[in-house]
Structures are given as structure tokens and as C-alpha cells.
């Protein structure tokens, strides 16, 4: 990976007490916290060699980022994802940025290498989530567009790029599109995440996946 590029990777992280509420019937609060920490470890592994800053209001997250992940940290001042990213833009000196959520543990170093190569020819690179969100956003300059996360942000960011006549590229990756919000999402980790901290952690909890031979889904996520 070309580490000579002056670029910052921004990872916004929600407070622990509001983490992954749709998993609350499947994982305890402590387990959801540890799931997040393992997902962050997988993401940091993919970003090896790049400068990373984690933005959060949660002191435990910031301590983990600083001491375990060796990342820079920014204490979030205002509520809301867009405000957190705007604050990071104001506090970092770097011009080029990549924004990545904290719940895409299947991202690989190869994806980041691809993004860095593409960045030579494009102003904006975007990878969609399965639900129409934005799971990776590269900006050649952090002031290129108005950040519009939440809702169908993929379409909003594309509209921003078109409105400003930017050179943009849609990086369509299934592995990046998988963000973890529901028990069903955990099944993708078992199928595609063999080398991840996240899968190893889920296995330690007695979680497993079985194929589902019906039109109602591909698999069933179970806990022993």
C-alpha cells in the first residue's frame, strides 16, 4: 500500500449505550460492545499504513482507539453523524479523506489499495451499503461536497457529485456493503469472514449459522 499519500481515514463511532439496538435480543450490551471493538480491529487491519482518526463521544471507545488501535481520536462535541464528520474535517489538517463506518468488518486491505489507485483519477469514490447508505466515501478534498449521511445517503452523495460536476466512481463491493445491524447480518460474517476478529468473537459466544432451504432466507443464525 502506498503510505506516502497524505490522507486521513475518519471513522465515526456511536456511544456504547446506543450500539446496535437491533441486536439487543440476540446479544447483551457487553457482547454488543465487544462486537464493535472486534469490528474496529478488523477495519484497522485493512487500513494498515494509513493515518486514522476515530471520532466519538464515548470515553471508552476513545481510550480503546488510542491505546489498543493506536489511532488518533477526536472527542465529539455535537450529536449526529454528519456533525461528527464536519467536526473532524475542521480539526484535521489533511485535505484528502476517506470516511468509513465502524460496522463493516469484511473490508480488506485490497479494497483500500483499489481506492488509493482510483483516487489518482477521481474526485469522489463511493461504496454503497446494501440498504442504500454510504459505507465508504473518498473525497479528494474534504470541502468538495456537503456530507449527507443517514437515510439513502448513497444517492444523496451521488447527487452532490453530479451537481458539482465531480469525477466520481462507484466502487461496488459486496464485502464493503455488509454492515452489521441485525442477527441475520451476522450470518454474512460466518460465510465471508473466515480471517476476521469478528467471526472468532462470535464463535466464542456459541453463535453459528445453518443453511436455510426455503425462500424465506439463505441461512439461520443460532446461538447454542
UniProtKB/Swiss-Prot annotation:
Pfam families: CofC. Keywords: GTP-binding, Nucleotide-binding, Nucleotidyltransferase, Transferase. It comes from the Archaea. Retains all activity when heated up to 90 degrees Celsius for 10 minutes and retained 38% activity after 10 minutes at 100 degrees Celsius. GO terms for molecular function: GTP binding; phospholactate guanylyltransferase activity. The keyword Transmembrane does not apply. Pathway: Cofactor biosynthesis; coenzyme F420 biosynthesis. The keyword Transferase applies. Its EC number is 2.7.7.68. It catalyses: (2S)-2-phospholactate + GTP + H(+) = (2S)-lactyl-2-diphospho-5'-guanosine + diphosphate. Guanylyltransferase that catalyzes the activation of (2S)-2-phospholactate (2-PL) as (2S)-lactyl-2-diphospho-5'-guanosine, via the condensation of 2-PL with GTP. It is involved in the biosynthesis of coenzyme F420, a hydride carrier cofactor. Is able to utilize other purine nucleotides including ATP, dGTP and ITP as cosubstrates in place of GTP but with a lower activity. Does not display lactate kinase activity. PANTHER family: 2-PHOSPHO-L-LACTATE GUANYLYLTRANSFERASE. Belongs to the CofC family. Homodimer. This is 2-phospho-L-lactate guanylyltransferase.
Amino acid at each position: 500500500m502506498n503510505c506516502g499519500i497524505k490522507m486521513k481515514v475518519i471513522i465515526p463511532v456511536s456511544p456504547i449505550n446506543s450500539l446496535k439496538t437491533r441486536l439487543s435480543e440476540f446479544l447483551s450490551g457487553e457482547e454488543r460492545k465487544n462486537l464493535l471493538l472486534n469490528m474496529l480491529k478488523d477495519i484497522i487491519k485493512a487500513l494498515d499504513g494509513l493515518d486514522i482518526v476515530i471520532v466519538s463521544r464515548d470515553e471508552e471507545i476513545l481510550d480503546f482507539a488510542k491505546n489498543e488501535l493506536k489511532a488518533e481520536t477526536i472527542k465529539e462535541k455535537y450529536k449526529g453523524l454528519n456533525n461528527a464528520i464536519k467536526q473532524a474535517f475542521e480539526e484535521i489538517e489533511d485535505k484528502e479523506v476517506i470516511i468509513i463506518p465502524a460496522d463493516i468488518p469484511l473490508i480488506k486491505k485490497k479494497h483500500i489499495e483499489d481506492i488509493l489507485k482510483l483516487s489518482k483519477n477521481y474526485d469522489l469514490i463511493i461504496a454503497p451499503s446494501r440498504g442504500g447508505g454510504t459505507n465508504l466515501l473518498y473525497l479528494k478534498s474534504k470541502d468538495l461536497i456537503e456530507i449527507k449521511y443517514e437515510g439513502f445517503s448513497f444517492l444523496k452523495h451521488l447527487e452532490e457529485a453530479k451537481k458539482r460536476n465531480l469525477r466520481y466512481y462507484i466502487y461496488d463491493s459486496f464485502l464493503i456493503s455488509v454492515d452489521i445491524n441485525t442477527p441475520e447480518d451476522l450470518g454474512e460474517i460466518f460465510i465471508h469472514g473466515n480471517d476476521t476478529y469478528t467471526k472468532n468473537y462470535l464463535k466464542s459466544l456459541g453463535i453459528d449459522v445453518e443453511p436455510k432451504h426455503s425462500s424465506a432466507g439463505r441461512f439461520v443464525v443460532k446461538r447454542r
